[in-house]
UniProtKB/Swiss-Prot annotation:
Name of this chain's protein: RNA exonuclease 4
Record flagged with keyword Cell inner membrane: no
GO molecular function, one term: exonuclease activity
Start-end of Gly residues biased regions: 343-357
Amino acid sequence: MDKKKAPGQTVASSNWLQLQSTLSTITKEKDVSNSKAHNSRSSQSPSSSLRSSSRIQRKSKHSQGVGQYMGRVEVASTAKTTVSQLRKGKVISNEPCILLEAFSDSPLLHELRHMVLGNHLLSESQKEPGQYLAIDCEMVGVGPNGMENTLARVSIVNYHGAVILDTFVQPREPVTDYRTWISGVKQSDLLGAPQFDEVNKQVANLLHDKILIGHAIDNDLKVLMLTHPGPLTRDTQKYKPLQEIAKNKRPGLKKLSELLLGVQIQTGAHSSVVDARVAMALYRLHKKEWERSVWRQTEAYRSISSVNKPEHVLGKRGHDEKEAEDGEETAGESKRKNRKKSGNGGGRQQFPGGGRKGISSGLDVIVRRNGQRVDENGRGDGTSRRKAGRGEISTFTGGESWWEQPAA
């Protein structure tokens, strides 16, 4: 006889009972796998556990990005680059960038990759400003919603990547957006930083008459409130061969660094030191062709600007960057050498009075009367002088001079 269910009692359906049994089986299997995993982790050696903890620490430190670098002593107006020996294999860098596989075994590429990381040894002479400087700035937001840019940090490196200037700048307006996630600048970094006018003057003095390299350099000059002569500016974003490689009319610095240097940058907050070094590295890779394409404009500008320079400044080209090591002699330098050789070895002998031997430096004045040439005595067309030279007539005939005669 069928059992009748009591009033108010609910009986589970067959489908629900089957689902419950399946769920209980899955739960038991998970418990068994979790217990096995726990036992395997507990059986690991202390050294492996230490390695895993160190990996976690490194990951957390790396995630802080440029903040680690920004808090160091090097970030100041008297900053010095960190130098170390070139190493093989994995490179440990204090900057937020990653060394990828090299595309070639070129010594120049090898040097430039380590220059970007600051992992290279420099001599004292290579730490001087020199004739080539690369610049990059970090900006924070001011105004409503932080939409306007203002200078917060400026970094300048030389031809070899040595830091010439790296300093925070105290904004002249209240900051409404520090953009720390991309600029790496925190509010505490700007406390006690140099005033804008002081940094502006310092940068202007450094950049005077230098070849200036940068990426989208107009943005940096704008926040610095400076200008730089076009013939002395090298913008890696506007250089056509780099645009063609990146297949973009406005290539990003990060993409160019990966394509040409094999260095991944801007993995977190940006570092203006790293970005300036990358711009310099890209310029040095193409320096020979780049300078050949603009040497006429550069030399024309220098020749014009040299007119207003004091005599003791003329011909001063700054510290030797040792471009010969890279085979980077420019077309302008080659032309100057050829002109110098032809000037010294052309067989022309110079004299104190100017001009060349056997050639008069004055002008002959020819006087004519009624369309006829007149000799030194004011007579005729000069035939009497020629005849006198042959002994045919006397050189002085006397009589009235032509200017004393009445007009016809």
